[in-house]
């Protein structure tokens, strides 16, 4: 009898369980689409929070540009609270530039950055010019790598905690490219590569830029992924009136919006609950803390305005009113305080012999615990050297531990640098410099500098770097000087002269804040006039030349070049002067310290 009852129970459970599972699987799938919009996309975070509070499950997510960034991070497990905290603590001015932290720059690069107010890259080939941008987006790309640790392999985005897709545009043929797989951080970077601002992402034969120029609200993409119900968050501005189209960026942006309008309207029609955020008064570049706070608040308000619509979706989805989705996240990111065990470290894009020096410079060791903060500092050190224009990394899990790979690109840049100076003596002077990293067997750099003003000058430098951070420099400089000499606040006399200098030197950077150098120099002074306030004073000065040997060192840890608040600075130089390599005017050489 007992066996009969037991058999009946087992049979009943076996019959009822598939029906129960089938009923759960029968609910409709929900997709969320997040539009592009730059800084305005901050509103997505709070809108997602309201969708969660309404008890709506999210089965798919697709986005463009900033929507791709928020959507991609949400898809791997970031909670809305984590996203909120992350965007608020970022230095967006730094992230949206290619600046390198001063502490990671070499002394030479620090001096150059302080001397010039404008630095403009110019390209070597038409290929670079066609695919260029004002910025490489290096800092932003490194942030994406930091935020996606654990997803650095080429992966299938459908296998993420929430299946994800993002949109980019291929400028080779104008086609929409939908990322369903690949390296997540690269896909997000491609989707937000604003043309003319950030350099595009090159992949195979494609040149990829911001997907907003072809599909800024990809509801069709999330539908194709399998979504039956679509919730959309749109942070695009409405088309501007004539009186608002006052600049080239305004007009170009309007042209793109008009081009995409038909596709946008079709995608809105696919949406079951459409959340349109009021972004009036804000632009794609509104990354100030106050703007971020307001945009997030407006995103939450816009989503709550659709609260009844969200609740009504539950019936369409096929879930109960008290349905609670499974918990989302949190993403266990590699924080600055958390460590991972790294078994091996590799460098892609460099000579094998350079690994030892790079390991020393990065201050990293294989078979040791390493934090994100250490990796970040290593990236700054690599980009701060004169050898590499870009540096990124991947951190992939292996059975023995993590494999850390740095991807480096040799620096073969050409730049035009401009500086301007105002003072009461010269009124104004302009400094113009052109610098090119040359593709020679031994890394080298050529620099031409001109100074326009009352005291004009020209200089040429050629630098060879046979070993990392050790270089030989050859230079020639010409200066015309017009100098007033003052006594008790009044001009006593004026002198003009021409100065020529040829120099050969060796420099060694033992430590990033310390530089030591020595060399030889030939100087020639050709004096022209000495004008005295008192006519009875006269002076005849013959032209003269010096052959000197010098040694110099500098130590600098200032946090800023001008008006530093912390750090220290020390510099010293010693020169021994002769006129025939050994003696001066028949006597022992004289020195200056």
Where are these regions (language model features)?
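Bacterial Sec-dependent N-terminal signal peptides
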Residues: 1-28
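A short, Trp-centered hydrophobic/proline-enriched beta-strand micro-motif
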Residues: 166-168, 516, 570
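Short beta-strands and strand-coil junctions in structured, solvent-facing domains, enriched
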Residues: 154, 238-239, 389, 468-469, ...
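Short, glycine/acidic-rich beta->alpha junctions
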Residues: 210-214, 454, 498, 588-590
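Patatin-like phospholipase
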Residues: 21-64, 72-380, 384-391, 395-396, ...
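Extended beta-strand-rich architecture
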Residues: 554, 564-566, 570-593
């Amino acid at each position: 009898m007992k066996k009969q009852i037991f058999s009946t129970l087992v049979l009943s459970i076996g019959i009822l369980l598939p029906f129960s599972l089938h009923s759960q699987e029968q609910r409709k799938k929900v997709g969320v689409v997040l539009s592009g919009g730059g800084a305005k996309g901050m509103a997505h975070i709070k809108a997602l929070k309201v969708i969660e509070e309404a008890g709506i499950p999210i089965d798919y997510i697709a986005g463009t540009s900033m929507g791709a960034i928020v959507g991609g991070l949400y898809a791997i497990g970031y909670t809305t609270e984590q996203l909120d905290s992350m965007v608020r603590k970022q230095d967006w001015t730094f992230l949206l530039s290619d600046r390198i932290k001063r502490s990671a720059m070499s002394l030479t690069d620090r001096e150059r950055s302080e001397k010039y107010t404008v630095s403009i890259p110019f390209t070597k080939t038409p290929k670079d010019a066609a695919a260029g941008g004002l910025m490489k987006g290096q800092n932003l790309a490194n942030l994406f790598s930091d935020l996606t640790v654990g997803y650095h392999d080429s992966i299938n985005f459908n296998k993420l905690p929430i299946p994800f897709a993002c949109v980019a545009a291929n400028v080779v043929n104008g086609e929409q490219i939908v990322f369903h797989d690949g390296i997540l951080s690269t896909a997000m970077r491609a989707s937000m590569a604003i043309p003319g601002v950030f350099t595009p992402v090159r992949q195979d034969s494609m040149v990829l830029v911001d997907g907003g120029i072809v599909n800024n609200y990809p509801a069709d993409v999330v539908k194709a992924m399998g979504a039956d119900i679509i919730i959309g968050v749109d942070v695009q501005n409405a088309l501007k009136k004539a009186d608002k189209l006052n600049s080239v960026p305004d007009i170009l942006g309007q042209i793109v919006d008009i081009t995409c309008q038909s596709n946008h309207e079709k995608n809105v029609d696919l949406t079951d609950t459409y959340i349109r955020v009021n972004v009036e008064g804000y632009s794609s570049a509104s990354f100030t803390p106050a703007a971020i706070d307001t945009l997030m608040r407006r995103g939450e308000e816009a989503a709550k305005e659709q609260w009844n619509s969200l609740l009504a979706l539950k019936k369409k989805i096929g879930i109960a009113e008290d349905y609670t989705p499974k918990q989302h996240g949190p993403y266990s990111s590699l924080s600055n305080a958390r460590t991972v065990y790294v078994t091996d470290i590799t460098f892609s894009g460099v000579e094998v012999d350079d690994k030892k020096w790079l390991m020393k410079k990065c201050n990293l060791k294989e078979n040791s615990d390493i934090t994100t903060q250490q990796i970040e500092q290593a990236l700054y050190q690599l980009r701060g050297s004169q050898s590499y224009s870009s540096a990124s990394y991947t951190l992939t899990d292996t059975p023995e531990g993590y494999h850390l790979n740095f991807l480096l690109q040799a620096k073969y840049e050409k730049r035009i640098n401009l500086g301007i100076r105002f003072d009461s003596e010269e009124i104004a002077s302009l400094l113009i410099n052109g610098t090119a990293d040359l593709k020679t067997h031994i890394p080298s750099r050529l620099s031409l500098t001109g100074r326009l003003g009352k005291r004009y000058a020209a200089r040429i430098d050629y630098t060879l770097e046979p070993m990392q951070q050790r270089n030989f420099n050859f230079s020639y400089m010409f200066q015309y000087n017009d100098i007033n000499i003052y006594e008790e606040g009044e001009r006593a006399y004026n002198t003009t002269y021409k100065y020529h200098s040829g120099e050969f030197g060796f420099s060694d950077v033992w430590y990033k804040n310390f530089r030591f150098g020595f060399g030889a120099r030939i100087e020639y002074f050709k004096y022209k006039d000495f004008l005295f306030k008192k006519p009875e004073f006269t002076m005849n000065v013959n032209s003269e030349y010096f052959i000197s040997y010098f040694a110099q060192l500098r130590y600098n840890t200032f946090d800023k070049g001008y008006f530093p608040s912390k750090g220290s600075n020390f510099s010293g130089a010693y020169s021994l002067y002769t006129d025939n390599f050994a003696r001066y005017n028949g006597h022992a050489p004289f020195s200056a310290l």
